[in-house]
Amino acid sequence: MRTFISIISLLFSTLCFSQATTTVETVIVDSGKYEFKLQAKKDTADYSKAFRILTNQVKLNPKNAEYRYFLGYTIDRLNADDGKGMFQLKKEMTVKASEQFEEVNRLEPVYKGELFILDPYAKLTSIWGSLAEAYLNRRLADSAKWAFSEGKKRGGFIEPILEFNRQLLKSCDKNAILVTYGDNITIPIWYLQTIENYRTDITVVDANLINTIWYSKYLKSERNLKISFSDAVIDTIEYKEWQSQQITVINSIDTTQKFSWELRPTYLDNYILKGDRILLDIFQQNFYSRPIYFNNNSDSSYNLFLTPYLVDEGLVNRVTTKIFDYSTDVVTVSKNLYNYNIDKVQKEDITKSRDAAIVLNGFRWAYFNNVYHLVTQANYDKAKELIKLMGDKFKTDKLPFTSIEVEKYFADIFQQVDKNYR
């Protein structure tokens, strides 16, 4: 009996030790990731501890894709914590971060670990595109082309993202200003304009980067964008208190042409951010001389609360001087919707990258927004035509929905159309 109890005790102790060891290993494993995410929340971050922990974890378990993913992110943040330091990026650090994400893609072509923001393919695009832009800011065009090409060679700038952005640029009129949001739109456009010399007539304004000092100056000097602020003033512009007020833009050539709208606070209900002040100036200086677009589905606080004046033109929204009332004004389906396609995109290129699937589903949302507006006006014939067009161009076996909830949301509207279609 004692022997039996001793055996049970030994087994229990071994099990407890095994569980404790596993728990300790898990804590150690997660601590690097935890430390990185902890620092990422701070205004002034120090990623040195996360770097030490994650470097050690990669040495102990080099085939763990998640360790490498977060080590790559940590190295990138050590290179430049945000867009403010982007123009000072170092090539050596970019290469080291890139090597980690490249290994992630080799170990897991479809990454299964936790994502921080971008998937590994999109992050490769981001870090190499940022280095290229830093070179462009220093007027090193050949170095910028090298960085873009190197990024593509190492696994970034995948074709689905590039093709989406080609068609987004194609949606804009000549000499347009396009206000964009996020790395998956802005950086691939930089690539297309620099490497493929595609739609270089368009000036891209990234609404996030414009909060930095260097980017506004770069747009003035290198992209020939009219901004009334001097460089000295740009150095001093900050966020400020703001109450909702009417903004009026006057055509300098024909002063009888005026456009007014209400600009509300863009931050915390009583402030306007530095970037929004500069974006407002860009709008005032260029509205009557160049067409201005926002990429589709932009939030009102990002587009200076111009939403009522935006006309849906597929992947982009054009700013007009007239409020469009979807309850009364006739919806005109943009010709752009008849031209979009993903014929050049391979299915495996979409499914291996979460961000590619999300970006390309922007095509579906462009069609769906028009279908929704047509349904509100009981124009079921046109809505049915558009649904068929979307289904033919973007089949689910090639471009999956990003979630079951989104697919069901679409299906509910489509059923409403089928029910009323004659």
Q: Predicted segments — roles?
A:
Residues 179-183, 207:
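Short His-Asn-centered micro-motif
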Residues 1-26:
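Bacterial Sec-dependent N-terminal signal peptides
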Residues 19-174, 194-422:
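ER/secretory pathway lumenal C-terminal domains and tails of membrane proteins involved
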Residues 187-188:
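Phosphate- and divalent-cation-binding pockets in alpha/beta enzyme and binding domains
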